[in-house]
């Protein structure tokens, strides 16, 4: 009985510490975008549409994209968002409808320029050992609009450059 108060105090402190959430990185995950894509290899230039959002107030992330000029270039992805994993980086592990899977790492770069954001995506198609990367630099014009430039790099060959305008909702 004499140890009940210290045990209760330590248990309460441990529960409070584990329930404390990490500071938000200030990144928006509820957004829609229109992209213009230039494909250096195939010459398939065109537009695409993308939407991504968190489900309710959870960390479950869903995304969808579709090529507006081509058939068969659509994908639905589902992932789980880990906020502020290390050094302010948010990481999302995802699986896609085209047997793809990967990790998205995003970070606000406000210490460099206010409104700047970086994103790196690593992915693979199911049954393939080919790595694919997307490198993106984005600028938040205001709380609702973002402009981004990205380069898709599959197997060490920069294949596609995209300019995207996004609306945060």
Walk through the language-model features, giving the residues of each.
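Outer-membrane beta-barrel proteins
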Residues: 2-169
């Amino acid at each position: 009985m004499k140890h009940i108060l210290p045990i209760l105090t330590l248990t309460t402190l441990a529960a409070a510490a584990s329930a404390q959430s990490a500071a938000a990185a200030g990144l928006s995950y509820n957004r829609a975008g229109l992209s213009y894509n230039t494909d250096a290899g195939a010459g398939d230039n065109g537009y695409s549409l993308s939407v991504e959002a968190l489900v309710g107030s959870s960390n479950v992330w869903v995304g969808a994209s579709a090529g507006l000029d081509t058939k068969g270039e659509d994908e639905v992805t589902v992932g789980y968002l880990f906020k502020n994993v290390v050094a302010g980086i948010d990481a999302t592990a995802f699986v896609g409808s085209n047997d793809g899977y990967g990790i998205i790492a995003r970070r606000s770069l406000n210490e460099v320029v206010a409104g700047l954001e970086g994103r790196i995506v690593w992915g693979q198609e199911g049954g393939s050992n080919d790595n694919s990367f997307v490198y993106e630099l984005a600028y938040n014009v205001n709380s609702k609009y973002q402009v981004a430039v990205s380069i898709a790099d599959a197997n060490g060959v920069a294949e596609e450059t995209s300019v995207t305008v996004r609306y945060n909702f």
